[in-house]
C-alpha cells in the first residue's frame, strides 16, 4: 500500500528508499538503471542516470558525484546523448535510442535536474548546445524541426530503424515535432543574454 501524507497525496518516502537501495552506486558515484530480471544494476552510462536529479530523489552530494561522473561522457557538440559511446563488443545494429542520438525529453528532464541542484552553468552549456544545433539544422535544411538528432555531429541526419520524422520531405509534420518544439522554447528560456545573442547571429548567418 502506498504511503500517503495527511492530505492524501502520495509520499515519496518509499520511492526515495527504493532509488537509494537499487539505483545508487557509491563506488561509481552515479545512479544506474536496474535490471529486475537479473536483480542487478546495468553499469552503463546513460542519460537516465541523471533523472534522479529531475525527480529530486538524491542528496546534493549524490547529485555532484553523478554530474561529475556522467555528464562529461554524455554531453556532445549538439547536446546530451542518450548513452555514452557503445563498445564494439556489445553494440549491434544502430538503434535510435543509443549513442550518438539525442532526444528532446532527455534534454528537458536533465536541464531541470541540473537547475534543481544548482548546476546552472552546466545546464546552460547543455541547453546552448542543443538549441544551437536545432537552429542550424532548421535554417540550413527544411525550415522545420525533426524528432531527434545526431548530437555527436550536431545534425538532423540519422541512419536508424525508424528514420527521423521531419527530416525527409515526404514526411514533414506541419509545425515541427512536438517535444522538439517544446525543448527549443524551454532551452532558449534558460540561456544567458550572451548565448541568445550568439544564436541570433548564427540564425542570421546560415
List the predicted regions and their residue ranges:
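Conserved, charged catalytic cores of large soluble enzymes
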Residues: 1
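Intrinsically disordered, low-complexity segments enriched in glycine/proline and serine/threonine
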Residues: 4-6, 71, 110
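Short amphipathic alpha-helical coiled-coil/interface segments
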Residues: 5-20, 127-130
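Alpha-helix N-cap and coil->helix boundary residues
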Residues: 7, 26, 122-125
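Extended glycan-interaction surfaces of carbohydrate-active proteins
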Residues: 14-102, 135-206
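Alpha-helical support elements that line or immediately flank enzyme active sites
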Residues: 48-60, 107-120
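Feature representing long, continuous alpha-helical segments
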Residues: 105-112, 121-124, 128, 182, ...
Amino acid at each position: 500500500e502506498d504511503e500517503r501524507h495527511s492530505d492524501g497525496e502520495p509520499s515519496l518516502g518509499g520511492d526515495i528508499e527504493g532509488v537509494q537501495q537499487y539505483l545508487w552506486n557509491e563506488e561509481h558515484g552515479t545512479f544506474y538503471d536496474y535490471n529486475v530480471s537479473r536483480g542487478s544494476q546495468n553499469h552503463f552510462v546513460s542519460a537516465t542516470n541523471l533523472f534522479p536529479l529531475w525527480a529530486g530523489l538524491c542528496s546534493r552530494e549524490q547529485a555532484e558525484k553523478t554530474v561529475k561522473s556522467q555528464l562529461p561522457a554524455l554531453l556532445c557538440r549538439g547536446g546530451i546523448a542518450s548513452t555514452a559511446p557503445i563498445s564494439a563488443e556489445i553494440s549491434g545494429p544502430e538503434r535510435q535510442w543509443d549513442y550518438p542520438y539525442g532526444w528532446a525529453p532527455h534534454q528537458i528532464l536533465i536541464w531541470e535536474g541540473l537547475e534543481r541542484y544548482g548546476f546552472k552553468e552546466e545546464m546552460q552549456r547543455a541547453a546552448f548546445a542543443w538549441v544551437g544545433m536545432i537552429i542550424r539544422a532548421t535554417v540550413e535544411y527544411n525550415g522545420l524541426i525533426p524528432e531527434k538528432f545526431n548530437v555527436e555531429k550536431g545534425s538532423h541526419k540519422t541512419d536508424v530503424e525508424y528514420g527521423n520524422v521531419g527530416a525527409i520531405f515526404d514526411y514533414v509534420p506541419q509545425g515541427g515535432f512536438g517535444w522538439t518544439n517544446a525543448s527549443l522554447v524551454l532551452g532558449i528560456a534558460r540561456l544567458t543574454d550572451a548565448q541568445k545573442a550568439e544564436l541570433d547571429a548564427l540564425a542570421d548567418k546560415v
